[in-house]
């Protein structure tokens, strides 16, 4: 048995998320289909993050279990990558132990991109367009209310019937303008739950616009209303999984994929 850790990137706009589904096109489904096309057998995969429909990734980590040893592993991985649709790419790979836990991460970093400038036709799939200029400093100040350990039940898509923990820690949030003058809201933490970052982002914007107060946000964190969630949830296409880090250094092999 051979265990590999892949780093993959994808444009998630046209996909129904990471997790494989019977009647929908997903990233995991396309990856396993590509492996099957090369190996002619089902290959088991597990992603570090279950990105939602429409969400992108620059560094999704995927654990792959092979029941055989390819003679030229780098060539094999590159062939699989070339078999994938053009909006999914394998960036690199590394051998890992059988007991490696792909979801036991040290930190995940997501970034949500907002365009408060002129409409950008060629990047509209990767950003949320707003019609008025925003103050980065004010957005950053509002965002800090969510830093730390809180019960995020009100700011996540968790159903009352689901047994999912909602108390988690966000280590850091920061807001900046990138080189293209777009606004980026960065979220760094170990665990994020369904829709959490999108809901936090839209609540930051709602607070900025005066639709909800900081006092209300604080109350919803300290004592979340039972069985209810916020009505504010940002569009998925502005969100990207930027990076995943583990407790120990995992050095992925990028060179061989490039030079072969």
Curated annotation (Swiss-Prot):
GO terms for biological process: tRNA pseudouridine synthesis. The keyword Isomerase applies. It is an enzyme of class 5 (isomerase). GO terms for molecular function: RNA binding; tRNA pseudouridine(38-40) synthase activity. Disulfide bonds: none annotated. Keywords: Isomerase, tRNA processing. Substrate binds at residue 110. It catalyses: uridine(38/39/40) in tRNA = pseudouridine(38/39/40) in tRNA. SUPFAM superfamilies: Pseudouridine synthase. Its EC number is 5.4.99.12. The active site is at 52 (nucleophile). The keyword Isomerase applies. Formation of pseudouridine at positions 38, 39 and 40 in the anticodon stem and loop of transfer RNAs. HAMAP family: TruA (MF_00171). Homodimer. Belongs to the tRNA pseudouridine synthase TruA family. This is tRNA pseudouridine synthase A. It comes from Spiroplasma kunkelii.
């Amino acid at each position: 048995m051979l265990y590999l850790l892949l780093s993959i990137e994808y444009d998630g706009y046209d996909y129904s998320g990471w997790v494989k589904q019977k009647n929908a096109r997903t990233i995991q489904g396309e990856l396993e289909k590509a492996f099957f096309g090369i190996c002619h057998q089902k290959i088991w995969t597990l992603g570090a993050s279950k990105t939602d429909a429409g969400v992108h990734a620059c560094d999704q980590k995927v654990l792959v279990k092979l029941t055989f040893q390819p003679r030229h592993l780098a060539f094999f991985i590159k062939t699989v990558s070339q078999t994938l649709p053009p909006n999914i790419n394998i960036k690199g790979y590394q051998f890992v132990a059988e007991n490696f836990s792909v979801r036991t991460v040290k930190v995940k970093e997501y970034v949500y991109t907002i365009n408060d400038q002129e409409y950008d036709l060629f990047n509209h799939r990767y950003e949320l367009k707003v019609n008025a200029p925003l103050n980065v400093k004010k957005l950053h100040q509002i965002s800090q209310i969510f830093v730390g350990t809180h019960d995020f039940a009100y700011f996540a898509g968790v159903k009352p019937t689901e047994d999912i923990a909602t108390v988690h820690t966000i280590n850091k949030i920061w807001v900046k303008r990138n080189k293209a003058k777009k606004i980026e809201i960065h979220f760094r933490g170990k665990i994020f739950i369904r829709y959490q970052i999108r809901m936090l982002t839209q609540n930051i914007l709602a607070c900025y616009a005066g639709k909800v107060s900081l006092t209300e946000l604080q109350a919803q964190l300290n004592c979340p209303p039972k069985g209810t969630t916020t009505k504010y949830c940002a569009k998925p296409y502005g969100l990207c999984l930027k990076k995943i880090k583990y407790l120990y250094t995992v050095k992925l092999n990028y060179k061989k994929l490039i030079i072969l």
